[in-house]
Regions:
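Jelly-roll (double-stranded beta-helix
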Residues: 1-415
Length: 415
């Protein structure tokens, strides 16, 4: 994120002395400066000023993130996943957003997981890539070394690689926190075509700087009612060995002899932020607009789009639902969040469903949907889409919640 922010106590000049307040006439101790930067020293970065040495590790041990293995989508089929079936109601209160994620789909570039959570997560740091966590339902407080967020329905939280943070659900037991987690092996950012060469959102972008929420900080241990010298465990996800079921992704638990919320100030252009899908201004036209018109983020070999309530095609002979199309270079994943998705009527897909349309197979409206859409002026639908440019494989959760029927849902017409 190229938009500069500064919070808390920082020195006038970078890489110069920044000290704690003097005590009894004695000079205060130095704060410890940390550069958190992307692409070595060649891209966005922030400087954080810690009370403690950020490299400190008192103890460590291996941990597992469970079954992260994947299975090829073979035979090649479109799939309908039902992630709402994955979490028994009794288990939700003990499940957290981080360790409770269940892998739906993945490849070497991106992994898509689902979680229904009622418990506080451990302190967590993803050392593999950036994350986007979309809040389907519920509310949470997210505490990070940059500051805190209050997140709720429709929020995308974008978390840079190696950001220490934790999730604390704040909704009722009847309204658990439902999240879909997009974990990249790269960075995630707004599409380059939305930005000037200096990183400002351009006029044609469907959202802009005013729509982004930045962390509220600084946030210190005492601000959350905890002690700054408490031993604290931080769970780190990273590449490694492990059994075949790990998918090459393992964890290490670091014990710190202090609380991770020890940043008295920071500044720079790298930090987590929130964007709410309701602030996305849809692009419409006289005839049907293709998915790139609905893009919100991009990563290496994948994009994220959202389809929001909007006025639809207004040519007198327009067909508002999509035409049939073959993703010759990509797999398409659609998460149906809310509303009435016209193109999928009759397929069994509803709120909370996820469809996978793989490359090599043409997909489009269900039988009768095109005719039924004629004359429609508005679509009341909300969906999040991820298109990948390498084939996706099925994770354990994807295999567990596949309805097994979707591939035949187009078979009732054309005879």
């Amino acid at each position: 994120m190229a938009h500069y922010q500064a919070m808390g106590s920082i020195p006038p000049k970078r890489h110069t002395q920044h000290r704690r307040p003097a005590k009894r006439g004695r000079m205060g101790e130095l704060y410890y400066e940390e550069l958190m930067g992307e692409e070595g020293f060649s891209s966005d970065s922030s400087l954080l000023y810690h009370r403690n040495i950020p490299s400190t590790v008192a103890e460590y041990r291996d941990v597992s993130f469970g079954d992260l293995s994947t299975t090829p989508n073979h035979p090649l089929l479109p799939r309908h996943l039902r992630p709402h079936d994955l979490f028994p109601a009794k288990a939700v209160k003990d499940t957290d957003v981080v360790t409770g994620r269940r892998l739906l789909l993945g490849n070497g570039d991106v992994r898509l997981s689902y979680a229904v959570s009622g418990a506080k997560s451990p302190w967590y740091r993803n050392g593999i890539g950036d994350e986007v966590v979309y809040v389907e339902r519920g509310r949470a407080r997210v505490e990070t070394v940059f500051g805190a967020f209050e997140v709720g329905e429709g929020d995308y939280l974008v978390v840079p690689r190696s950001t220490t943070h934790r999730w604390i659900p704040t909704g009722s037991g009847r309204d658990p926190l439902r999240t879909i987690c997009i974990e990249a092996s790269s960075h995630i950012a707004p599409p380059k075509r939305y930005l000037s060469k200096y990183g400002q959102f351009l006029e044609h972008s469907p959202y802009c700087e005013r729509d982004l929420r930045v962390p509220q900080g600084p946030l210190l241990a005492e601000d959350v009612g905890e002690k700054q010298d408490d031993d604290t465990e931080v769970l780190i996800k990273h590449r490694g060995g492990g059994p075949a079921s790990s998918g090459g992704i393992v964890g290490t638990l670091h014990l710190l002899p202090f609380h991770p919320l020890d940043v008295v100030g920071w500044d720079g252009c790298l930090y987590p932020y929130v964007f709410n899908v309701r602030d996305y201004e849809p692009v419409t036209g006289r005839i049907h607009q293709p998915p790139p018109a609905h893009q919100v983020f991009e990563g290496w070999n994948f994009v994220v789009c959202n389809f929001v309530p909007r006025k639809v095609d207004y040519h007198p002979l327009s067909i508002p639902v999509p035409y049939y199309h073959s993703n010759v270079d990509s797999d398409e994943v659609m998460f149906y969040v809310d509303g009435d998705y016209e193109a999928r009527k009759g397929s069994g897909i509803g709120k909370g469903s996820i469809s996978l349309h793989p490359g090599g197979h043409a997909h489009g409206p269900q039988p009768g949907a095109a005719e039924a859409s004629l004359g429609k002026e508005y679509f009341d639908e909300l969906a999040v889409m991820v298109d990948t440019f390498r084939p996706l494989e099925l994770g354990e959760a994807g295999r567990a919640c596949d309805d097994g029927l979707y591939a035949g849902s187009w078979n009732r017409a054309g005879r």
